[in-house]
Amino acid sequence: MAFELNGKTYETDEEGYLANLSQWDTEAAVYMAKEDDCDLDENHWEVINFLREYYEEYQIAPAVRVLTKAIGKKLGKDKGNSKYLYELFPYGPAKQACKYAGLPKPTGCV
Amino acid sequence: MSRAKKFMYINRHAPCGTVYAVEGLEVVLIGAAFEQDVCMAFIGDGVFQLQQDQDTADTGMKNFSPAYRALGDYEVNRLYVERESLQERGLTEEDLMPLTWEDEDEDWAEKSSIYIVDQAQLSDLMDEQDIILNF
Amino acid sequence: MLHTVNKSPFESSSLKTCLSLARGDADVLLIEDGVYGALSGSAHTSLVAEALGDVRVYALEPDLKARGLSRDRLIPGIEVVGYDGFVELACANDKIQNWL
């Protein structure tokens, strides 16, 4: 599967996750979010950028429990809780945000 | 809820030549979501999984060794490395990557996750477990 | 003859068997997990060090790097080669035996 944007083709798996991490750019993130009726604002980007940094360092996408705790440590308790994160990403913060961040589905997510 | 079960994942294979190491690590990360009492043991060639400075770029394989540093985030913070296995391979603790976890109860103090244990200690630890899985 | 060994000497007897059968004009190339046989200070170091008086032993650099093994950890006398060196060895020898 794939989608096209500004003449560039992005390969995806059957669930819409980018097949090739290095293809990711902000336009792709905005496009994938739009497909889910989600307009990315700065709060979304905060989480997306966090996930990309996490992947860069550890080579895995964190499970939701790990993400919540790490966000809390970095951005404060008012953001490091599942209510806040689920409001931003109603399909599941790890799953949905990882998709827009161009990462594979988090390890342990089914 | 019933009491958390004590899980030990035993890693016995070198990191790159087979899929045991990466598959085992994935199972540990997935299993950590179930909030059980999890530890890992590294024996035999498994101790090579913790070798510092692994760089797979020239082989075209993915380097998954940074993922061991995420284990602390998953609350897997007891990694037992068998002393005899290190010695047999000419390794010391200094050859291993430093792995730590942050103790939230002590203002995120960084603590080491690596414990070098001898065979007798490891046997005792195995006796304490409810479930032992080998990779 | 070129011999390649791709198993860890701690897991398999292939390195030991290979070295006991390799003749003086042989090249022995350690690849994949076989590169653990190049480690100095290990239980198998003496086996390889003794063979070095007889055969030439090489280790493949990308496989060493993938496993975090730097050159200073290797048994002196082992030559480190890249993929190009692997090809040269394969061409220079009339036969290849892979100790799988």
Kindly give the residue locations of the regions a language model identified.
Chain C
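Structural motif
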Residues: 5-8, 62, 100
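Short, glycine/charged-enriched secondary-structure capping and boundary segments
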Residues: 17-20, 42-45, 73-75
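Conserved acidic residues
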Residues: 1, 26, 94
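N-terminal beta-loop-helix "entrance" segment that forms/cooperates
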Residues: 35-49, 69
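C-terminal structural segments of small proteins and small subunits
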Residues: 67-100
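Short internal beta-strands
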Residues: 27-32, 55-63
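Short, conserved loop/helix-junction motifs that constitute active-site signature segments
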Residues: 20-24, 47-54
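Short, glycine-rich nucleotide/cofactor-binding loops
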Residues: 1-15, 34-40
